[in-house]
Amino acid sequence: MRIHEVNPQKGSTKRRRRIGRGISAGQGASGGFGMRGQKSRSGTGTKAGFEGGQMPLYRRVPKLKHFPLVNPSHYTIINVGKLNSLSPNTEVTLESLMEVGLITSNDGPLKVLGNGELTVPLTVRAPKFTASAKAKIESAGGSCQDLSDTSNAPSNNE
């Protein structure tokens, strides 16, 4: 057997239909385009979404703005200025702040923000610190212990 002797299997191919070659051919006269109108003329026709001059649906419908985050991270926040009321060399955690009454509701892990001035040396234990908060706590003679556990966090490679 040679390459020029290879043919498709019998019944596997179908002849293409010749459009517009007479009424008896089956697809003659208007060639499957119906009667008159823009869709039967030559050319590409209308663009997708065109409604004949009527205001199209995608312009009639109000657009959704400000999509919410899928997995927003919520933090219980406190500014360093509020920590001045604590006694010196105290260990500050989310639980201790709730006991003292500086924080009333637990909205998630503690995040320390840098608004205000700090004069008392404190040991602050929290998962998140802003850079200014960290600088103010350390300049007051205190220390920051980062509790964020990155060992169990999912990586992008998995």
UniProtKB/Swiss-Prot annotation:
<keyword id="KW-0689">Ribosomal protein</keyword>
<dbReference type="GO" id="GO:0003735">
    <property type="term" value="F:structural constituent of ribosome"/>
</dbReference>
<dbReference type="GO" id="GO:0019843">
    <property type="term" value="F:rRNA binding"/>
</dbReference>
<protein>
    <recommendedName>
        <fullName>Large ribosomal subunit protein uL15</fullName>
    </recommendedName>
</protein>
<comment type="similarity">
    <text>Belongs to the universal ribosomal protein uL15 family.</text>
</comment>
<keyword id="KW-0687">Ribonucleoprotein</keyword>
<feature type="region of interest" description="Disordered">
    <location>
        <begin position="1"/>
        <end position="53"/>
    </location>
</feature>
<comment type="function">
    <text>Binds to the 23S rRNA.</text>
</comment>
<dbReference type="Pfam" id="PF00828">
    <property type="entry name" value="Ribosomal_L27A"/>
</dbReference>
<dbReference type="InterPro" id="IPR005749">
    <property type="entry name" value="Ribosomal_uL15_bac-type"/>
</dbReference>
<dbReference type="InterPro" id="IPR001196">
    <property type="entry name" value="Ribosomal_uL15_CS"/>
</dbReference>
<feature type="compositionally biased region" description="Polar residues">
    <location>
        <begin position="145"/>
        <end position="158"/>
    </location>
</feature>
<dbReference type="InterPro" id="IPR030878">
    <property type="entry name" value="Ribosomal_uL15"/>
</dbReference>
<dbReference type="InterPro" id="IPR036227">
    <property type="entry name" value="Ribosomal_uL15/eL18_sf"/>
</dbReference>
<dbReference type="GO" id="GO:0022625">
    <property type="term" value="C:cytosolic large ribosomal subunit"/>
</dbReference>
<feature type="compositionally biased region" description="Gly residues">
    <location>
        <begin position="23"/>
        <end position="35"/>
    </location>
</feature>
<keyword id="KW-0694">RNA-binding</keyword>
<feature type="region of interest" description="Disordered">
    <location>
        <begin position="138"/>
        <end position="158"/>
    </location>
</feature>
<dbReference type="GO" id="GO:0006412">
    <property type="term" value="P:translation"/>
</dbReference>
<dbReference type="InterPro" id="IPR021131">
    <property type="entry name" value="Ribosomal_uL15/eL18"/>
</dbReference>
<comment type="subunit">
    <text>Part of the 50S ribosomal subunit.</text>
</comment>
<keyword id="KW-0699">rRNA-binding</keyword>
